[in-house]
Amino acid sequence: MKQTSAVVASKVIAADKAAALALTPVSRETEQRLDRYVALLLEWQAKTNLVAPSTLPHLWTRHISDSLQLLDLAPDAKIWVDLGSGGGFPGVVLACALAERPGAEVHLVERIAKKAAFLREAIRVTGAPGIVHLSEIGDIVEKWSGGVDCVTARALAPLHQLIGFAEPLVKRGAKALFLKGQDVEAELTESTKYWKIEPKLYSSRTGGQGWIVAIDCIERHN
């Protein structure tokens, strides 16, 4: 008897999850929160394009592990701001993992109302310490009044634009962590036309051609 496509898909996702958690181990409680988040995302994906459909079979390694690896680069950070959170990567994933860190809080900034609604539901369902801001990025970072330890972004904009978004927060002591792809060197070269930065590059733990750009000092060129 042939397996149905649903059964095959379920086995593929289960294998991908196992591979992801081997790369980026989490507590049982965090795993349960992530399971609820993934179930919700798959439900909403049918009506709202939250991630590229082609990446769904590898959701755990492609998106969740990719997000979780940021935690090792800011192990003491409690207050995070995720710019352009979209489907919740890395923001919701980080919030799920940080739920066990006293005082932790992840601010999810999203300008599209439908995606912001999804993010709110994801935070509700998982019980993760997240706050959703329906806002343009520039509006909220310029008015930010609280402390920030880390600012993140993934699949949002070219690096030189991300640096501009993050500048007000980095100047106040935040560390910027940007998930980028194979064109990272070209993006860094372009960024130096506008900004004085001393970035650190980390190869993505998930393999492929992914990179993490870490920046803790930003100055504009005169």
Swiss-Prot record:
InterPro entries: rRNA_ssu_MeTfrase_G, SAM-dependent_MTases_sf. Keywords: Cytoplasm, Methyltransferase, rRNA processing, S-adenosyl-L-methionine, Transferase. It comes from Bradyrhizobium sp. (strain BTAi1 / ATCC BAA-1182). HAMAP family: 16SrRNA_methyltr_G. Specifically methylates the N7 position of guanine in position 527 of 16S rRNA. It catalyses: guanosine(527) in 16S rRNA + S-adenosyl-L-methionine = N(7)-methylguanosine(527) in 16S rRNA + S-adenosyl-L-homocysteine. This is Ribosomal RNA small subunit methyltransferase G. The keyword Transferase applies. The keyword Lyase does not apply. It is found in: Cytoplasm. GO terms for molecular function: rRNA (guanine-N7-)-methyltransferase activity. S-adenosyl-L-methionine binds at G84, F89, V141, E142, R154. Belongs to the methyltransferase superfamily. RNA methyltransferase RsmG family. One of its GO terms (cellular component) is cytosol. Its EC number is 2.1.1.170.
